[in-house]
């Protein structure tokens, strides 16, 4: 099935599904949502509003909130909070500028960040964390550390599926799919939070920009250095309208991963995935 991706009209299919997901068809919508819940085994008791009737459209259902008490954000001062609910695809050290996508599949920071060597150089030999949000998961994205938004780079691209089978077979998938690279300044240095689009994902959305739409000019760079947009650890920064992938990047020698976090393991947003290394100021 994954070999068919290159032949499918990815963007057209995604637009059709996105349009359907906005339709408010009453009982028909509720019936479809119930089928989806049953198929994916979704626990609606975790939702802030468990009643299916609360959701007039699939988009409202996809972007449902969870009960806050079920996702406490780690309180340790130096802890890095998981930005999402999902499965850890890969994590670890960046080898030079190479990241692991899956066994025998690698891609580069330069390609991931829009072929900008100067931007990529800040993460050489750093650390990365890749999480996959399945269709059944909570689809909102949260801040791993306190930080100030300095830049967002929207990079148009393909819309391959990012499910585990595709990640293991499509070369350089994350560096080819549409994505929004969000750069934050933290007390521990630079941090990148990358929202990767995928087939059938309605859109990438951030709280400061809204829906991120491709432009005719290609790569779009949004500078927020003068805007003073700040987020606390655990605060929402964006969402997907289906399910996709989030990648974190950190500079060299600035963090240590939680040894309890391993590839293929499940995570919930707010959980401790690592700690920052204090930077000494001369």
From Swiss-Prot:
Binds 1 pyruvoyl group covalently per subunit. Its EC number is 4.1.1.65. Pfam families: PS_Dcarbxylase. It comes from the Bacteria. Transmembrane segments: none annotated. Keywords: Cell membrane, Decarboxylase, Lipid biosynthesis, Lipid metabolism, Lyase, Membrane, Phospholipid biosynthesis, Phospholipid metabolism, Pyruvate, Zymogen. It is found in: Cell membrane. One of its GO terms (cellular component) is plasma membrane. Its cofactor is pyruvate. The record marks 243-244 as: Cleavage (non-hydrolytic). It catalyses: a 1,2-diacyl-sn-glycero-3-phospho-L-serine + H(+) = a 1,2-diacyl-sn-glycero-3-phosphoethanolamine + CO2. It is an enzyme of class 4 (lyase). The modification Pyruvic acid (Ser) is found at residue 244. GO terms for molecular function: phosphatidylserine decarboxylase activity. InterPro entries: PS_Dcarbxylase, PSD-B, PSD_type1_pro. Is synthesized initially as an inactive proenzyme. Formation of the active enzyme involves a self-maturation process in which the active site pyruvoyl group is generated from an internal serine residue via an autocatalytic post-translational modification. Two non-identical subunits are generated from the proenzyme in this reaction, and the pyruvate is formed at the N-terminus of the alpha chain, which is derived from the carboxyl end of the proenzyme. One of its GO terms (biological process) is phosphatidylethanolamine biosynthetic process. Pathway: Phospholipid metabolism; phosphatidylethanolamine biosynthesis; phosphatidylethanolamine from CDP-diacylglycerol: step 2/2. The active site is at residues 85, 142, 244. It is a peripheral membrane protein. Heterodimer of a large membrane-associated beta subunit and a small pyruvoyl-containing alpha subunit. Belongs to the phosphatidylserine decarboxylase family. PSD-B subfamily. Prokaryotic type I sub-subfamily. Catalyzes the formation of phosphatidylethanolamine (PtdEtn) from phosphatidylserine (PtdSer). This is Phosphatidylserine decarboxylase proenzyme. It comes from Coxiella burnetii (strain Dugway 5J108-111). The gene is psd.
């Amino acid at each position: 099935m994954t070999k068919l991706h290159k032949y499918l009209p990815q963007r057209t299919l995604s637009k059709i599904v996105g349009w359907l997901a906005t339709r408010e068809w009453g009982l028909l919508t509720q019936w479809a949502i119930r089928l989806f819940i049953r198929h994916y085994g979704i626990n609606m008791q975790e939702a802030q509003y468990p009643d299916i009737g609360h959701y007039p459209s699939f988009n409202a259902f996809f972007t449902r909130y969870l009960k806050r008490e079920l996702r406490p954000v780690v309180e340790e001062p130096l802890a890095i909070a998981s930005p999402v609910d999902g499965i850890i695809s890969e994590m670890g050290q960046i080898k030079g500028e190479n990241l692991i996508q899956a066994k025998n599949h690698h891609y580069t920071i330069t390609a991931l960040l829009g072929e900008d060597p100067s931007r990529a150089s800040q993460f050489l030999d750093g650390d990365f964390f890749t999480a996959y949000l399945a269709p059944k998961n909570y689809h909102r994205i949260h801040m791993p550390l306190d930080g100030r938004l300095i830049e967002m780079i929207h990079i148009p691209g393909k819309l391959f599926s990012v499910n585990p089978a595709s990640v293991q077979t499509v070369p350089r998938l994350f560096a080819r799919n549409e994505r929004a690279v969000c750069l934050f300044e933290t007390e521990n240095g630079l941090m990148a939070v990358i929202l990767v689009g995928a087939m059938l994902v309605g859109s990438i959305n951030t709280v400061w920009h809204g829906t991120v739409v491709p432009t005719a000019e290609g790569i779009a760079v949004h500078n927020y250095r003068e805007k003073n947009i700040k987020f606390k650890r655990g605060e929402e920064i964006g969402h997907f309208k289906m399910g996709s992938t989030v990648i974190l990047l950190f500079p060299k020698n600035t963090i240590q991963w939680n040894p309890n976090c391993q590839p293929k393991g499940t995570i919930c947003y707010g959980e401790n995935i690592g700690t920052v290394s204090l930077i000494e100021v001369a």
